[in-house]
Amino acid sequence: LDDPKHLLLMIKRGFYVPKTYVPENLTAVQIPVAHNDGNNLMRKDAADALESMYKDAKKQGLILAINSAYRPYNEQQQVYDEYMVTYGVQTAVKLVAEPGCSEHQLGLSVDLTSQSVMDGTYAVFGQQMNRAISVM
């Protein structure tokens, strides 16, 4: 599986996609975006699945929001470099994918938060998720 269009593509350190790869079917996900920066693009199949998950989560009282979705190679490079400078190599390589081996570049990955984190009700996303799961 070396075709970037394939949903089961192996992408990690050592398995890279070209710098110029951009998914053909990027679409705007119809859920809130935390930073209002327009970073809500995903491949259509992933966007559809996320929208379905959003609706299910909303029924449970969780209002999800996108922190970051599709990232082109050059943007992933910026994030990677910032983490290297801020946190050092040992931490950065654990937290951020190398440019060219990020599922964000494939349009299949999304970083989520919630409305309650954005408005300050919860400090971190996991606190709200743990509470929601415990009441199910």
Regions found by a protein language model. Give the residues of each.
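Extracytoplasmic cell-surface/polysaccharide-interacting catalytic and binding patches
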Residues: 1-69, 73-136
